[in-house]
Regions:
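PLP-dependent enzyme catalytic core of the Aspartate aminotransferase-like
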Residues: 70, 167, 307-344
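Active-site phosphate-binding strand-loop segment of PLP-dependent enzymes
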Residues: 128, 133-187
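PLP-dependent aminotransferase class I/II
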Residues: 36-37, 202-279, 283-286
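Short Gly/Ser/Thr- and Asp/Glu-enriched loop/turn motifs at secondary-structure junctions
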Residues: 81, 286-292, 318-322
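Short acidic capping loops at alpha-helix termini that bridge into adjacent secondary structure
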Residues: 79-84, 183, 201-202
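Conserved PLP-binding catalytic core of the aspartate aminotransferase-like
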Residues: 268, 280-312, 327
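Conserved PLP-anchoring active-site segment centered on the Schiff-base-forming lysine
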Residues: 100-119, 126
Length: 344
C-alpha cells in the first residue's frame, strides 16, 4: 500500500460534502435568517483581549462552561461541568464519536442527516441503515440492538423535522445501545432528553450554536453525557478545538438569550405559516418542529420544483425524499409561497 493508493481510495469511496449554490434567497442550510444582533457584536469586540490572541485558550473556557451548565440545566435537573464538553461545531463531535466507536455496529434511520454517511465513510465505518417506516422507527427490525451498537438519531429529524416519540426514544435507550441524540434543532421544538443522562449511561446529547443562536460561522457545538463518556471524549478530541472568539460570541449569546428566544418564537410562527400555506397548495408537508419545513416529493417533481425555485433566485435543499426549505424572514417565505403557487 502506498500513500498515492490511499489518496485514490479516498477519492473513489469517500463522498465529498456539497452544499447548494448560493443565491439571493438562500434557504438550503437551515441557517438562522436573522443577523447576529449588532449590539452583541459590539459587546464581543469590546471584550476581546488582545493578549489572549497569541495564546492557546482552554476549550471550553471556565466562563463559557459555566454559561453552558446554566443553559443546559432544565426543570429540576442541574447539569454538572463534568457532564459537558465542546466541539468545533456539532459536526466535529459527530466525527469524533464515529471515530471512537468505529468498531461497533452503527445504525442510522434514513432519511436522516447526510453527514452521518459522509463522516462514516471518511473514518472507514460501515453504517447499518434501517429506513424509517413513514416517520416512525421500525423497531421490529431492531430487536438485536445491544451494547455493541451505536445509534445516531436527529431529534427533530433532519431532513423531515418531525419529532420521534417517547416510546421510540426509550425503546432505543432500554436496548442498551449507545444513543447519540442529535438535538441540533432543540430550541425550535422545546423537547430535550438531556436530563436522562442521570439514568442512562448510554445517552449522548449533541447540540449546536449554529441554528438558534445564528453562529454557524463560529463553529460551536457541545455534548452532554455522563462523566465517563465526557472524559473519554475529551481524551480523543483535539485540544483547543474551539476558538477564543467563537467561545466569546457563544458566551455573550447565552448571557443575552432572551433576544434569541424572541427570534425563535418568530421563526416558529413563520414555520407554522409556511407549513399551512404549502398544505393549502396540496403539498404533503411533514409536521416539522425544527427551523425548516419538508415537502415529500418524488424525484422528478422535486427536480422540477427545485429548478423553478432556482430560476427565481431561491435555493432549497433537494434530497432523495423531497425538498427541505429553511424558514426565512417573512418576505423570503412569502416569495417561496408565491413561487410555488405559480407552479401549481
Amino acid at each position: 500500500v502506498s500513500f498515492s493508493s490511499v489518496v485514490e481510495e479516498i477519492r473513489k469511496n469517500v463522498e465529498a460534502y456539497r452544499s447548494e449554490p448560493r443565491t439571493l434567497t438562500y434557504l438550503a442550510l437551515n441557517e438562522n435568517p436573522y443577523p447576529f444582533p449588532e449590539e452583541l457584536v459590539r459587546e464581543c469586540f469590546e471584550r476581546i483581549d488582545a493578549s489572549r490572541l497569541p495564546t492557546y485558550v482552554d476549550s471550553p473556557s471556565e466562563e463559557f462552561l459555566n454559561e453552558l451548565v446554566d443553559y443546559v440545566s432544565i426543570g429540576g435537573w442541574k447539569a454538572q461541568k463534568e457532564q459537558i464538553s465542546v466541539g468545533n461545531g456539532a459536526d466535529e463531535i459527530i466525527y469524533v464519536l464515529l471515530s471512537m466507536f468505529k468498531d461497533l455496529s452503527i445504525y442510522v434511520f434514513p432519511p436522516t442527516y447526510s453527514c452521518y454517511e459522509i463522516f462514516a465513510s471518511a473514518v472507514g465505518v460501515k453504517l447499518n441503515r434501517v429506513p424509517l417506516a413513514g416517520e416512525r422507527i421500525d423497531l421490529e427490525r431492531l430487536k438485536d440492538l445491544n451494547e455493541d451498537c451505536v445509534v445516531f438519531l436527529p431529534n427533530p429529524n433532519n431532513p423531515t423535522g418531525h419529532l420521534f416519540t417517547d416510546e421510540e426514544i426509550f425503546r432505543l435507550l432500554n436496548s442498551g445501545a449507545l444513543l447519540v441524540l442529535d438535538e441540533a434543532y432543540y430550541e425550535f421544538s422545546g423537547r430535550t432528553y438531556a436530563p436522562l443522562i442521570e439514568d442512562y449511561s448510554n445517552l449522548i446529547v449533541v447540540r449546536t450554536f449554529s441554528k438558534a443562536f445564528g453562529l454557524a460561522s463560529q463553529r460551536i457545538g457541545y455534548l452532554i453525557a455522563n462523566t465517563a463518556l465526557i472524559d473519554a471524549y475529551n481524551r480523543i478530541r483535539l485540544p483547543y478545538n474551539v476558538s477564543y472568539t467563537g467561545q466569546l460570541f457563544a458566551t455573550v449569546a447565552l448571557k443575552n438569550r432572551r433576544i434569541f428566544e424572541e427570534r425563535i418564537e418568530r421563526i416558529v410562527e413563520e414555520r407554522e405559516r409556511l407549513k399551512s400555506a404549502l398544505r393549502r397548495l396540496g403539498f404533503n408537508v411533514s409536521d416539522s418542529k425544527a427551523n425548516f419545513v419538508f415537502v415529500y416529493l418524488d424525484q422528478k417533481e422535486a427536480e422540477r420544483i427545485h429548478r423553478a425555485l432556482l430560476e427565481r433566485g431561491i435555493t432549497v435543499r433537494k434530497t432523495g425524499w423531497g425538498l427541505r426549505i429553511s424558514v426565512g424572514q417573512t418576505q423570503q417565505n412569502d416569495l417561496v409561497i408565491e413561487t410555488l403557487e405559480g407552479l401549481m
